[in-house]
C-alpha cells in the first residue's frame, strides 16, 4: 500500500508485460462449480466487484507456477523492495475486469482450499502400496473441501458466499488467516546478494 507513484507505474507496466497473460479469471455465476474448479493447496484471489446493489465475483489463481511469488521493484535509493505477486495482481485488477462489469468498488482477498487428504494405503491388498497411494492421490483431486483459509480482513458476506459455493458444512474448517497464504513460497525468496 505504501509504494511511490513511480513504483506504481512500474508495477502496472510489469503487470501488463509479464503477469496478465497468465491470468485466467473465473467469473462466478450460478453455473460455476467451485468445488470442481479449485485446486488443492493453490492460492487464489476472490474478487468482489460492486455497483450499488449489483455484485459480481471472480476468482484469480495466483500463477506462481509461471511467475515468481516475490517481485523485486526498482528503487531510487539503496533500499531493496519486494512486492508479493498477489499485490501486483491487485494493482492491475482494473486491467482485467474493466469493460466486463460496471463497478464502483473492486476488492480482492486471498483464499486457499484443502481437500480431504485421508489415504487408505493398505485398502486393496491385491495392489502395492505405491498403487494404492497413486489411487488415493487421484481421489484427492476430486475430494470435497475440508478446510477453507481466507484473509481475516475479508468481509463476512464474502466468507459466507464462499462457504456456500464450496458446500462447506459445520464440521469443515473455515480459518481466518493472514493476507498471504502458502508461505512455502518463502523458500524461493530471491537472494539479496
What are these regions (language model features)?
Residues 1-193:
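N-terminal non-catalytic structural scaffold regions of very large proteins
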